[in-house]
């Protein structure tokens, strides 16, 4: 096994919840005063090895973005330790690392400086960045006038050209159009072949299964499951559709066993409410909604659905 480039051990992170700005001021003046606290992350353990691609999944509010912000050093944990090796570069919140008053070209050098690159190094990479971003003359306009899609084009183009050892992406690619997303995923695969370690947060199950070597399921600030991406995504989807006691039992089962395939739900032990309809096959049936697209060289064949 290759050497670890990232180790998260016993990490906790919480945030105070204030009823009013006055309470926030009072707490700032009296740090020991009692306030309500939201526990965003609890006892996180995660080791990432060189060249791995890790997918992190979980519902909104599970703690995914908080974990990535801790890993990149944007925030510090309440307790625990995070060890990093090499250059860690992240694409987190849209527009982070950019000055809205600067032009796109100025922000390339500004963002590069934040990431530890010299002006000469960024000069050498400028043409590659402009070519990948493909935003034309807008590169010399202030980024405050950019659309979200243009912003992510420029941000992604910068970070992939800063020689990262660890690349962290937090759902930002979902903003781009389909063509740009395909270009980004092709570039990520190229970085994988070069041994770059990638942490990817995405709600796109297909992307996690296709790109990642391992997946992590975060829920309510806890790591419930780590393992093969297809199995982790499957259990994540099961968890999404559970509520109340059933959800609590499944979470406990995942924590204790590290797998969800042996779990027996309440519904599986009861009689089905709806009986399956008999199958009908007719070769003469022709769908009226079929849409044919111009071929671009890719052919899909033997399309079928596999059960988990």
Swiss-Prot record:
One of its GO terms (molecular function) is ATP hydrolysis activity. SMART domains: AAA (SM00382). Keywords: ATP-binding, Nucleotide-binding, Transport. Pfam families: ABC_tran (PF00005). ATP binds at residues 58-65. Signal peptide: none annotated. One of its GO terms (cellular component) is membrane. Residues 6-245 form the ABC transporter domain. Belongs to the ABC transporter superfamily. Influences the expression of the surface array protein gene (vapA). May have both regulatory and transport activities. This is ABC transporter protein AbcA. The gene is abcA.
């Amino acid at each position: 096994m290759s050497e670890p480039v990232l180790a998260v051990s016993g990490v906790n992170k919480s945030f105070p919840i204030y009823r009013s700005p006055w309470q926030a001021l009072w707490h700032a003046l009296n740090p020991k005063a009692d306030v309500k606290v939201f526990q965003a992350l609890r006892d996180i353990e995660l080791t990432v090895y060189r060249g791995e691609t890790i997918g992190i999944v979980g519902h909104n509010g599970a703690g995914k973005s908080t974990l990535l912000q801790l890993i990149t050093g944007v925030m510090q944990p309440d307790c625990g330790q995070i060890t990093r090796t090499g250059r860690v570069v992240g694409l987190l919140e849209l527009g982070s690392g950019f000055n809205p008053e600067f032009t796109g070209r100025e922000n390339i050098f500004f963002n590069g400086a934040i990431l530890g690159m010299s002006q000469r190094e960024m000069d050498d990479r400028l043409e590659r960045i402009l070519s990948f971003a493909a935003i034309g003359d807008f590169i010399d306009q202030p980024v405050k006038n950019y659309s979200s899609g243009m912003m992510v084009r420029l941000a992604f183009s910068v970070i992939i050209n800063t020689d990262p050892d660890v690349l962290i992406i937090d759902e930002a690619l979902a903003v781009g159009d389909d063509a740009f997303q395909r270009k980004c995923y092709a570039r990520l695969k190229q970085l994988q072949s070069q041994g770059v370690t990638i942490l990817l947060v995405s709600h796109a199950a297909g992307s996690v299964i296709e790109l990642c070597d391992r997946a992590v399921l975060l829920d309510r600030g806890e790591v419930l499951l780590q393992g093969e991406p297809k199995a982790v995504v499957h259990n994540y989807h099961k968890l999404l559709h559970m509520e109340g006691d059933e959800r609590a039992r499944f979470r406990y089962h995942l924590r204790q066993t590290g797998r969800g395939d042996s779990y027996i739900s309440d519904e599986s032990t009861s009689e089905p409410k709806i009986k399956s309809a008999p199958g009908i096959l007719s070769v003469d049936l022709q769908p009226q909604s079929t849409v044919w697209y111009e071929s671009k060289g890719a052919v899909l064949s033997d399309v079928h659905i596999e059960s988990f």
